[in-house]
Amino acid sequence: MQPELAQFVIDRIAVNALDAGADVGGPGCNPNVIILATSDGPGMARRLVREFRLGFRPAVGDTNLSRAALGDFQNSGKPVRWWNVAIPVEVSSGEIAARMYGDLLYPDGGPIPVVVRVRDGSRLRSNVRYDMAWTVIIIDMNRTGGAPLGVLADYVSMVSLAQIDPNADLSDQQTVMNLFEGDATVRGLSSWDRDYLAALYSAPTDRNNPGSQEAAVARSLVTLRRMQDDPQGRQAEPPEASRRP
């Protein structure tokens, strides 16, 4: 991809990230989203996994998808493939709270993971949250079907900012994720996409299980939609009979 086109994609992703409420670093920052454009998606994926395997499965625990999913990442024929890595961190300090596979290369087992401090006895909140550590995205330019670059950049934004199941059926949603599913109406991030990302980044991140975390995002989405319907936050007026003079 030509440098000016690559910069366009980077800028588009940054704008979408800011709109969602994500933090965006400036020039010279340590990037955690790596985007590669190639004419051979499977070949590039296999080479990356072979040479940087710990980057795809870095920790002992649920930081990424299964080995089978990693095989799909390497061998699928999709125009865009991605791999997200989420790392458990201690809520109050941000320190990594898991044993990393790379640590096992040290004779003494490497640094000891941070001891998680118990803040309170709440059953709703966890002392550990999962942060998106990095994402690898490969665009197979021979398979994108001439998708407009802006729409492609929005698609890449979505998989950069959220953990999207590559095999999810979203055909009943108005979403940029249907770009390569034969949906000619896709013109970029939809209102559904933007609202979902905004809810994802505004919801609390310390719920104590995946179901509770999903519910927190859903509540955030409902609140966002209500604010859009009533931007001034007006309360519904009481019935006539109950009004005071």
Model-found features: residue ranges?
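Short, solvent-exposed mixed-charge patches
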Residues: 242-245
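Long, folded non-catalytic interaction modules
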Residues: 2-12, 17-238
